Amino acid sequence: YFKFTQTRSIVTSGGLGTMGFGLPAAIGAKIGAPERTVCLFVGDGGLQMTIEELGVIMQYGVDVKIILLNNNFLGMVRQWQQLFFHERYSETPMLNPDFVALAASYGIKGRDVERREQLDDAIAEMLSHKGAYLLNVAVEEKGMVFPMTPAGSCVTNIMLNVNEKY
């Protein structure tokens, strides 16, 4: 978990099912607070929902750092299917483009991270880069993400793991 040390440090849809919210929200956060570093943590499915917004980053020179957690799945949908629908999986595997090459076509620097030991150097490079940056981080295909807000619930009912609610 990431421990925030100051207020007004996170923008979230709060589990309201707004897949694709992240990239436009990060762009808006950076435009609204240009002096702050804005990092977007997003899955490959969520990024693909609004990937055309990379054009906004290019056109307006928005310095957003994108940490793409790439598992080649619609990960949260798959997680819901596993936890709440008795592992009846449907339509969640994804065949993805080369995200670093795609970012480059928008003038955005990028890098692939395939092993954990590459991560520290890659993050340092991303944060020191002046301008937008996409860090494509390969993560476990079937890993789950917590905390999470179950569908139809609210942030006061977050799940901390498979068996524990807050």
Cite the ranges covered by each PLM segment.
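Thiamine diphosphate
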Residues: 1-166
